[in-house]
A protein has these predicted regions:
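Structured-RNA-binding interfaces characteristic of tRNA pseudouridine synthases
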Residues: 1-261
Length: 261
């Protein structure tokens, strides 16, 4: 009998064309599917919670797949990590109900954007931080953040190519911390448009450089015009940190759950 398994996956996106399997480039999804096929002897297709772009990283990507293999769910990290490159790690495996869907059942996501605000950059952090060599006005950046909170039409915060049916989104939390020369932005919401977090980060950088006023986000909500906001920040500063699901999504039928009790 087929079971549905949910994996939690961490990856450094530097070497990859993104999460989603593509014809031109090596994707994270492809490598995990190939490892699963070897492990189970089945042709496996996985569905991810977020289709991260080339160069974007993940600490908490989630993906589900169906299998008739009797490999215990908690053993998948051990099995798959022996086959995967070191920049992709499976951190957890769980059995979920047949109706669970990693992408369509999400109720929120948290993203982290990292900025290195130093003159000369960093050899060690070059792939995980966006480097800004000019001093940023962090106070001005923080002043702009609360405007994003709540439910708004984020049409101006979507890059061309976005296919969302609605641009109404709810941002539940924003936070900016400074640790030495590192500026860390956290954004959490119910869902995000294409390149939305990178556009927010790019606008904050321009606010920090005094190229845009701190009310740029307010203006964008008024005009719904992409030109009201800053450039899209580089992909390598972005990380998908956590994916949230409603508690009921994990409730297993008694016949399946009994062996866990």
């Amino acid at each position: 009998m087929a079971r549905r398994i949910l994996l939690t996956i961490e990856y450094d996106g530097t070497a990859y064309s993104g999460w989603q399997r593509q014809y031109n480039g090596l994707a994270v999804q492809q490598l995990i599917e190939e490892a699963l096929t070897r492990a189970t002897g089945e042709a496996i297709t996985i569905t991810g919670a977020s289709r991260t772009d080339a160069g974007v990283h993940a600490l908490g990507q989630c993906a589900h797949f169906d299998t008739s293999s009797r490999i215990p769910p908690e053993k998948y990290p051990f099995v798959l990590n022996t086959m995967l490159p070191r920049d992709i790690r499976v951190q957890a495996g769980h059995e979920v109900p047949d109706g669970f869907h990693a992408r369509f059942m999400t109720c929120g996501k948290r993203y982290t954007y990292r900025i290195l605000n130093s003159r000369h950059g960093s050899a060690i952090r070059r792939n995980t931080f966006a480097h800004i060599p000019v001093p940023l006005d962090v106070d001005a950046m923080r002043q702009a953040l609360p405007t994003l909170l709540g439910t708004h039409d984020f049409a101006a915060y979507q890059a061309s190519g976005g296919t969302a049916k609605t641009t109404i989104r709810t941002i539940r939390m924003t936070e900016m911390t400074v640790q030495g020369d590192e500026i860390i932005l956290l954004v959490e919401g119910d869902a995000f448009l294409y390149n939305m977090v990178r556009i927010i980060a790019g606008t904050l950088i321009e606010i920090g450089l005094h190229r845009r006023s701190a009310d740029a986000f307010t203006e964008a909500f008024r005009t719904l015009d992409r030109l009201s906001l800053g450039v899209t920040a580089p992909p390598h500063g972005l990380e998908l940190t956590k994916v949230y699901y409603p508690e009921e999504a994990f409730r297993m039928p008694e016949a399946v759950r009994w062996h866990e009790e």
